[in-house]
């Protein structure tokens, strides 16, 4: 099962490493990970995606809560939330007709960010599922030179689920 976990941690050296080590020590793979400061520079938000059983995930969440730098943690999987992922994809100009490329980009809301040295850099911001679909649609037609992805970002709809003072 795919799980999206959101964690507020103190923005201090080693805090992220302690969280990652906890997952690693339990042989629980992190599929994607994004970390950045919140509006309060002393607090960072970790958004991570992992796959696995609910029992193991529940155990890891309980143990993560005990880490000294963790302020709060929640499994957002069953909540109502917005999810976005950002990807940059580099392809060679002329490897696909402009009409076909434009049709693909229109279908997924992607854009051409730049054209330089006979390469396009494409940009897409969507759900992880749609980003995967777009990459699949592109690779079905042409080779991708390079790709970089942000990993999933998620935030609850409505009232915040994570509290900085918990």
Regions found by a protein language model. Name each.
Residues 1-4, 8-44, 49-166:
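Long, contiguous binding/interaction regions
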